[in-house]
Amino acid sequence: MNSKIEDMSNFFDLRAKSYDTHMKKNVDNFNVFYKRVSKPIIKTNKKVNILDLGCGTGLELKNIFKKCPNAQIDCLDLSKEMLEVLKEKYKDRQSQIKTITASYLDYSFKEQKYDYILSVMSFHHILHKTKLNLYISIFKALNPDGLYIEGEYVVNQTKESRLYKEYLKVKEEKNIEIDGTFHIDIPFSIKTQKQLFDETGFKTFQLHYHENEAAVYSVKK
């Protein structure tokens, strides 16, 4: 693990314009992966309310609008530059998209209930307890029978343990709290993810895609 770590918002602000190209090169079967993110969403012309956490430049929105052309989507990200790229890409959908510049670790989920909440390649920078608390907030923000969808960087349990130990080493060396505030990878295994969802109270775990270290799964409230 690279001991040089960067503040999360600065990291993504600096890379906003090149982010899409980077993801296309680094996500296994990029097009298939992002198409699978929208797979659990039911096709409808009705208005559905969706919250996209750590939305970045909105790579997942294209396929979502194909299935739900009248969706209202709240797009939350701590990088203002990422959101600017998103708004330019989807300027013809500006009446359907609300951008929120904030960290999902500090965001209040109390204002609205959602039919779907999703996160894509965003939650692998936070630890078990922090992620559990975030899942609890997500659970509460969903409508009855609402669905949470996650497309994520996943690893086997051996690599999960190794990267966690490396994280602890960096934390000790830097003598700072870096959980969720700095760009450092702490990915989990699918087994750990299932345990977290069980602890939260989610049900009906479904694995929609798993290729190398990229996976898409969903759970129901």
Predicted regions and their residues:
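A short glycine-rich, Lys/Arg-flanked "PGG" loop and its adjoining helix->strand segment in the class I
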Residues: 133-144
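Core SAM-dependent methyltransferase catalytic element
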Residues: 200-221
